């Protein structure tokens, strides 16, 4: 399977990085191909809704690092949305990447991709992840894609917290068993 990870975290060794490392380790054991796009370290211009792209009929006016991501997204079987919780939503870096889906909308919408959400945050409350989950779910409804799993690491200020609470193991198992979940 081809898996694209869209990582919105600006922390190379943070909690989300740990969860993604474990997820990737699981996918490698299962023999899958992974393309990781670390949005915080890429040049991604925000979409300005100029509509020159025609949702995929023409090239986007911004020729930035998204140009390399688009073909990977198109061939992906699974897309992983990963972000630490910032004000109960995804990071601006990840949201900018998702907004730029517009440039190839006609090729993504209705393509039947499977998706996963990986998020971490310090708030341990059940409600803490509702905002990011709702945003994710609405994007999937629009794109007509299907959620196949989530790792929601609540109450994790550090990667050690995520390790101790078993979220790394959960991410690993999700990666290892992704093909079964994607059926």
Which functions belong to the PLM regions below?
Residues 1-82, 88-103, 165-183:
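N-terminal beta1-alpha1-beta2 submodule of the flavodoxin-like/Rossmannoid cofactor-binding fold
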Residues 38-41, 153-157:
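Short beta->alpha junction loops
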Residues 92-93, 109-150:
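Short, glycine-/small-residue-rich phosphate/pyrophosphate-handling segment
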Residues 106:
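Conserved adenylate-forming
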Residues 127-130, 160-165:
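Short, solvent-exposed loop/turn segments at secondary-structure boundaries
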Residues 136-153, 162, 172, 177-181:
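A charged, well-structured terminal subsegment
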